[in-house]
Amino acid sequence: MKYCKLQDLCTDIIDCPHSTPEWKNSGIRVVRNFNLKNGNLDFTDGYFVDEETYLNRIKRAVPEAYDIIISREAPMGVVAIIPENLKCCLGQRLVLLKVDKNKVNPVYLLYVLMSDFVQTQFRRADATGSIVSNLCIPDLKNIIIPVIEENQDDVSKLLASINDKVLLNYKINDNLAA
């Protein structure tokens, strides 16, 4: 195993636009903090923008399949991976990781970002003293990531399979509670 800074495993780390777009009833999805759940995107509560707003919000980077989104605050350090065939842009307080697939499997990185090892680093990086926790980009870039050099794909598949079972259990519990 080796240890790398997050910035060394990404081709880019992009902060989202710091503005609230004008919402539409339909159109292109906007990922917001509350859409990030257990490494996945949950669009139970959906927000949309029109094409013009979308094009404005993706000027820094276009979110693509297997990019990872991290919340910078409220709550801080929650992550999700972008699935295939999702056209979206980011809302406020989010960061887009363009994962270098030649260096790390994006699914492996997603689960490492969810680990206690990394989440503890996120909490330690928040030294603002503010009531609202905040993860700033320079601190995020320097987060240390443990990288196994062999079997990343196998580990990623196993963790994704376990996560799928957990999500299924949540759905079953929701149906039983209804």
Predicted regions, residues:
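Short glycine-enriched, charge-decorated loop/helix-capping segments at active-site entrances
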Residues: 46-49
